[in-house]
């Protein structure tokens, strides 16, 4: 039975990784900076406590926040956790005197993790989780101002900033209980992902189609 569970976990991990790298989990202009919006870490019990479950050590819960908690893995058992997350984004504001609104829905996996005992009071844990997400598209129009020494020659220009992508975290850790109520843990983490950002400026045509683009 333990071998079957390990095989199932091994099959689901690449599927979850593929789903994560092909989806957008954020819709915010603030994600244009750095690696984007960071996700709340941990499994559901940890997230329900606001992500402060570092000290939580239970034989029935996989604690992704603290590798020392892996030492609580019960003998002859295998803990497997798979989490899903759905979010709704709604924004309403006035633009040029008109009310406009946007709404987005996302649904994706949040974490996949397992924990198993290596020996008495020695446990191993593995997790694959989305670390951060990028998703934005903003548009700005610079009106024509003939009195401006620069923009008077350029004319009306429109700017579009957009980006999407994500960063995924994979973690492998070991926890060892030295004595009662005292455990040590160590973990190795690896991050990967793709974030694409682009900037396009379209001025009023002077010659040709008047379009210039630059991708960063």
Per-range role (PLM):
Residues 96-100, 155-160, 208-216:
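Extracellular loop and loop/strand-boundary signature of outer-membrane beta-barrel proteins
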Residues 4-14:
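Bacterial N-terminal signal peptides
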Residues 90-97, 137-145, 196-205, 210:
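Outer-membrane beta-barrel translocator domains and adjoining extracellular loop/strand segments
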Residues 5, 55-57, 169-170:
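Short hydrophobic "helix-edge" motifs at membrane interfaces and signal-peptide entry regions
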């Amino acid at each position: 039975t333990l071998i079957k569970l390990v095989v199932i976990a091994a099959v689901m991990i690449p599927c979850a990784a593929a789903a994560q790298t092909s989806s957008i989990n954020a819709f915010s202009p603030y994600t244009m900076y750095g690696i984007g919006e960071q996700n709340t870490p941990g499994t559901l019990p940890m997230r329900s406590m606001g992500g402060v479950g570092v000290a939580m050590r239970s034989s029935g819960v996989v604690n992704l926040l603290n590798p020392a908690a892996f030492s609580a893995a019960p003998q002859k058992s295998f803990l497997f956790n798979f989490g899903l997350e759905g979010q709704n984004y709604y924004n309403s504001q006035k633009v040029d005197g008109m009310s406009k609104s946007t709404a987005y829905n996302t649904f994706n996996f949040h974490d996949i993790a397992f924990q198993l005992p290596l020996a008495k009071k020695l446990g191993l844990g593995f997790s694959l989780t989305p670390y951060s997400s990028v998703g934005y598209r903003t548009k700005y129009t610079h009106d024509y101002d003939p009195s401006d020494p620069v923009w008077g020659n350029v004319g009306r220009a429109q700017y579009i900033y957009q980006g999407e992508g994500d960063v995924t975290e994979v973690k492998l850790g070991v926890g060892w209980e030295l004595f009662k109520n005292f455990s040590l843990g160590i973990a190795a983490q690896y991050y990967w992902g793709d974030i694409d950002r682009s900037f396009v400026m379209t001025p009023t045509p002077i010659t040709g189609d008047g379009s210039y683009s630059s991708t960063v």
